[in-house]
């Protein structure tokens, strides 16, 4: 487990205060005091003005997953900015940051940082390690891969199905970033684009994957894991709020998802894996948010087309999403 450097008498608070911008609100500066100048009802000549109003500032603790001192980051509104802040804190090129996990230094895809961060979550950044090229013979239509991405241009393996084509190739592991297929660069591609390319590869042919694995500490070099189910392992984050990172628009501090929303997001994420070979809790959360107040599947389809038209979801998938949201609403899990 990575350790922080040095001894600390008291950990700094996660929420600090900073000065508000000048000119916000009336501070009474320059207003005349009581006649005679001796009263205490207004500001006096020669004294500094009252302190400006304070506003909360969100500060998160972070480490490099393979081991580093503890850094503190703030002032980001999306995943790309988050990676930039992490790189700045540890003096790394931003492109070295592959993905982040919450409250564990392990390559645990159930703890992957997506679109939400608990206000007391500890962020572990996984950076690029060994590069490798692997030849794969596509003996079946399905390779057994589930793809996700980091929201900043890197697609990587989130899950490997047991007994699948890829499962028999032990050089390929969960967490490996897919840089290229047959020499075609995939940097900047979304997960669904990579999944589609893999699906379209002809059966009975050999193809080449160029991969980069996360850098490992000595205690992390062990047999690979195909990924567990959500909710496994200790829940270390205790913040009651969550910072919602959006690809468009500012980040917002929100309450934790309700039980209905959590279950609906999980079911929609399962549908994304089943239909498209990807997992993306942020995308699933957006779909639940769009669908929870819709009255029928047609309204949901219209909302998805307007907000997420690039995905071109098939009608049967939209219908299943509508059903999953409806089941979660009535507690039919």
UniProtKB/Swiss-Prot annotation:
Gly residues bias (residue ranges)? 23-44, 228-240
Can the keyword Plastid be found in this entry's annotation?
no
User: A Gene Ontology CC term for this entry?
Assistant: synaptic vesicle
Q: Which UniProt keywords apply?
A: Congenital muscular dystrophy, Cytoplasm, Dystroglycanopathy, Membrane, Phosphoprotein
Do the record's keywords include Metal-binding?
Answer: no
Phosphothreonine: which positions carry it? 242
Domain of life, source organism: Eukaryota
Q: Name one matching Pfam family.
A: GIPC1_GH1
Could you mention a single GO BP entry for this protein?
A: positive regulation of melanin biosynthetic process
Point out residues bearing the modification Phosphoserine: 68, 222, 225, 232, 247
Q: In which tissues is it expressed?
A: Widely expressed. Expressed in skeletal muscle (at protein level).
Q: Which residues form a coiled coil?
A: none
Its chief place of residence is cytoplasm
Q: Which PROSITE patterns match?
A: PDZ
Name the membrane topology term: Peripheral membrane protein
What's this chain's function? May be involved in G protein-linked signaling.
Q: What PANTHER family does the record point to?
A: PDZ DOMAIN-CONTAINING PROTEIN GIPC1, RGS-GAIP INTERACTING PROTEIN GIPC
Assembly information from the UniProt record: Interacts with GLUT1 (C-terminus), ACTN1, KIF1B, MYO6, PLEKHG5, SDC4/syndecan-4 and SEMA4C/semaphorin-4C. Interacts with RGS19 C-terminus. Interacts with HTLV-I Tax through the PDZ domain.
Protein name according to UniProt: PDZ domain-containing protein GIPC1
